[in-house]
């Protein structure tokens, strides 16, 4: 008779610690790409609907992931090192 394999992987952090770390990382990235008032309003919306619960944390993580994914998919014009990319002319004639 087959038996389920034993869990031999590395020990994971507790779920709530991992979740908070993910949320903090998403928040840091989100403030680089979206206006703070939008993010504040999103936080208020989540709080009004979920209160101070893990379900609310999971909801805001899901929404931030979706927003960032769409933002990057459409074409983010923010640089990860703080330098905005300049758009070149179509024929490249402005090169020196």
Swiss-Prot record:
GO terms for biological process: DNA-templated transcription; monoatomic ion transmembrane transport; protein homooligomerization; regulation of DNA-templated transcription; symbiont entry into host cell; symbiont-mediated activation of host apoptosis; symbiont-mediated arrest of host cell cycle during G2/M transition; viral penetration into host nucleus. It comes from the Viruses. Signal peptide: none annotated. Phosphorylated on several residues by host. These phosphorylations regulate VPR activity for the nuclear import of the HIV-1 pre-integration complex. InterPro entries: RetroV_VpR/X. It is found in: Virion; Host nucleus; Host extracellular space. GO terms for cellular component: host cell; host cell nucleus; host extracellular space; virion component. The modification Phosphoserine is found at residues 79, 94, 96. Residues 1-42 are annotated as: Homooligomerization. Coiled coil: none annotated. Keywords: Activator, AIDS, Apoptosis, Cell cycle, Host G2/M cell cycle arrest by virus, Host nucleus, Host-virus interaction, Ion channel, Ion transport, Modulation of host cell cycle by virus, Phosphoprotein, Transcription, Transcription regulation, Transport, Viral penetration into host nucleus, Virion, Virus entry into host cell. Homooligomer, may form homodimer. Interacts with p6-gag region of the Pr55 Gag precursor protein through a (Leu-X-X)4 motif near the C-terminus of the P6gag protein. Interacts with host UNG. May interact with host RAD23A/HHR23A. Interacts with host VPRBP/DCAF1, leading to hijack the CUL4A-RBX1-DDB1-DCAF1/VPRBP complex, mediating ubiquitination of host proteins such as TERT and ZGPAT and arrest of the cell cycle in G2 phase. Belongs to the HIV-1 VPR protein family. HIV-1 lineages are divided in three main groups, M (for Major), O (for Outlier), and N (for New, or Non-M, Non-O). The vast majority of strains found worldwide belong to the group M. Group O seems to be endemic to and largely confined to Cameroon and neighboring countries in West Central Africa, where these viruses represent a small minority of HIV-1 strains. The group N is represented by a limited number of isolates from Cameroonian persons. The group M is further subdivided in 9 clades or subtypes (A to D, F to H, J and K). During virus replication, may deplete host UNG protein, and incude G2-M cell cycle arrest. Acts by targeting specific host proteins for degradation by the 26S proteasome, through association with the cellular CUL4A-DDB1 E3 ligase complex by direct interaction with host VPRPB/DCAF-1. Cell cycle arrest reportedly occurs within hours of infection and is not blocked by antiviral agents, suggesting that it is initiated by the VPR carried into the virion. Additionally, VPR induces apoptosis in a cell cycle dependent manner suggesting that these two effects are mechanistically linked. During virus entry, plays a role in the transport of the viral pre-integration (PIC) complex to the host nucleus. This function is crucial for viral infection of non-dividing macrophages. May act directly at the nuclear pore complex, by binding nucleoporins phenylalanine-glycine (FG)-repeat regions. This is Protein Vpr. It comes from Human immunodeficiency virus type 1 group M subtype K (isolate 97ZR-EQTB11) (HIV-1). The lineage of its organism: Viruses, Riboviria, Pararnavirae, Artverviricota, Revtraviricetes.
